[in-house]
């Protein structure tokens, strides 16, 4: 499992690796859990919610910034409204990632039209001042640039996976990533 990846059954082990059915006990448990949730089992829905909430929040937070909690909530609502449409339970985390990123980008774009309040709370690892500085620089990037930067550099997805998630061609991903990194470095002062 890569560093920073969700330690959850059925989650992909490598960046950009497509989710695929697993034959492990954890994979079978996840499949059974998803199938139970699809049949309306409230306990299974609650277990899935407990599994997905931190993962979806980790995806939405850096993209939607101050709207991260709202994006997380909207993504989880969309996931559970549409759980019955998920054909392959082993693909749960990839499917949830697509929904989370789309909701985060949507809310980030909507939030970009208004003046943003400073970010008060984002989970930080290590140096809190460094985390605050990174948040400040991320706030200066456009939602499209934040999304590409987070998916490539924080989530470790390849260009093809980012392209599929955002619904843009791979050359657009490369261009946005180049500009996002350049703007990040410029804002960082390095």
Locations of the language-model features?
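Sigma70-family region 2
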Residues: 38-39, 62-63, 74-91, 110-114
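Arg/Lys-rich amphipathic alpha helix in sigma70-family domain 2
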Residues: 81-88, 98-119, 127, 179
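N-terminal module of bacterial RNA polymerase sigma factors
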Residues: 1-54
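Short, charged helix-capping/linker segments at alpha-helix termini
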Residues: 38-46, 57-74
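Short, aromatic/basic-enriched loop-to-helix "N-cap" motif that marks the start
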Residues: 70, 84-98, 170
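A short pre-motif secondary-structure segment
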Residues: 148-152
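DNA-recognition helix of helix-turn-helix
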Residues: 101, 105, 160, 166-190
């Amino acid at each position: 499992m890569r560093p920073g990846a969700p330690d959850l059954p059925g989650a992909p082990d490598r960046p950009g690796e497509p989710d695929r059915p697993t034959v492990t006990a954890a994979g079978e448990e996840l499949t059974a859990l998803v199938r139970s949730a699809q049949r309306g089992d409230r306990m299974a829905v609650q277990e899935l919610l407990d599994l997905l909430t931190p993962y979806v929040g980790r995806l939405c937070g850096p993209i939607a910034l101050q709207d991260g909690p709202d994006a997380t909530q909207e993504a989880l609502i969309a996931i559970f409204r549409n759980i019955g449409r998920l054909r392959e339970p082993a693909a749960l985390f990839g499917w949830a990632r697509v929904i989370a990123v789309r909701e985060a980008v949507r809310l980030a774009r909507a939030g970009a039209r208004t003046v943003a309040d400073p970010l008060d709370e984002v989970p930080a690892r290590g140096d809190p001042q460094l985390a605050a500085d990174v948040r400040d620089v991320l706030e200066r990037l456009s939602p499209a640039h934040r999304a590409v930067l987070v998916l490539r550099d924080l989530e470790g997805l390849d260009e093809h996976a980012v392209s599929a998630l955002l619904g843009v061609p791979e050359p657009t991903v490369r261009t946005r990533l180049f500009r996002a990194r350049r703007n990040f470095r410029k804002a960082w002062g390095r």
